[in-house]
Amino acid sequence: MNNDKEINSEKSKRAINHFSNKKEIKNSDRRGILFSKLPSQQLNPDRYDNLMTFWNNSLIDISKSCNILIFTPKLLSTYFTVENVSPIYLPLILNEMIKTKFIVKYEEYIKDYGWSKWVWTKMVVQPFQYYTGLSTPNTETEKNVKFILPEMIKDKAEQLYQHQLKNMNSTTDNIISYINLEKSIKDWYITREELDLLLLVLFRDSKVLILTNNKIKNINNNNNGEDRIGIKFAFDGEKVQPIQETDFGILKLQTTYETLKQQESKLLTDIEEISNTIKESIRIKQKNHALLQLKKKKLLESILEKRATASTNIHEILFSIESAKSNQQIIESLCTGVSTLKKVNQEISVDQVDSILDDYQDAITNQREIDDAMKSGFNSVESLSSADIDEDQLEKELDQMLQDHLTLEKEEKQKQKQIEKEKQQQQQPPTSQFNPNLPIPLKNEEDELLKELESLSVTSNPLPKQDENKQKTSELI
């Protein structure tokens, strides 16, 4: 496992690389503006807001990208150095962040929680002081005072809790050794002091409790947190339960089981190496050496068998404990249910139930009698009202009405057709005087037509000139 110094070194490299690759920083002109002096908010509010927004976002960005949860002005100056140039006015910017509570000294952050429990004070706060040197005077206080982003810490603490919830598949998985917790988030690249800070937040939210080595009575400031042997997490949607003796037993079994599995893995590797050595000794005909290695192999195999048996037994014990805890939860739930049921039933007696049911039955019977009476009454009224009516006469009258209706409907349709026909005739264009479809009159017919025309001309008034022309034209025809 990487120590805190290696982790901090790696995070510094990542932070420097991440910041230098920002688009605004790659542009030298833009970088010069961003690295310039922070103006007065009263005199130049727009420029002030733009610069503060940039530096706030930059700090959040590297914190999230590189998991930098605790930082100092000196470290930030290193992170923000580009081409050997750092923002010399960074302290002024940090002061503005402090004023707005955007960043907080984590010493104050710890004090603000106001914990009085001995466990947390001894197991976490004092190790923090060891990490940071807060318990001793610092010659470079301003540069080395450590700060945090409160919102970032809260988000990361919740992320840690959700990470552990995914691994809690049984009633005993909520207890984990401190070392295994560190291993499970190894890829996060956070230091032990940062992990403790996250646990601090979860402790405040009643999501974790710290299992400590109860053999240590007086905690030394230089213990580096080694007395914290395990963490007990709350199940989803619940508050963490108080630590019990069984929790220490479970943690001890888990630790022993993991140790045995590691020993088994080591023994298997050693046995494999010895087997290869035996083969090589046989190949070069070193019988005595091969025999010695074979005895060693048999001894290791015997030890391996014992370790495997022990680990199996411990695993079975853990499984039994898990089953017992599940049974305990079931019994507790049943007890709660029975107690609640008794309290509810105290307000209801058997006589009360019988009385209510009798009243209910009487009410239903009475309702049915009323319904039957009303139904019978309506039937009687209907029969009386229809006694003097001739049903056959009604049917004949109804048939006649239907027939009249059909006749009227037929007449209406015929009238409608006649109206539509007349409309169509009116809409047709006038026909020409000469219709080629008419039959051509014969000569005798022409003579008769001419005589009739002459008789008409005698009796009628003289035709206008235009009509005379038409007449001549007709005669010519």
From Swiss-Prot:
Annotated signal peptide: none
Gene Ontology BP, a term: late endosome to vacuole transport
Keywords carried by this UniProt record: Coiled coil, Cytoplasm, Protein transport, Transport
GO cellular component, one term: mitotic spindle pole
Biased composition (Basic and acidic residues): 411-424, 465-477
Protein role: Plays a role in the endosomal sorting pathway.
Full protein name: Charged multivesicular body protein 7
Species of origin: Dictyostelium discoideum
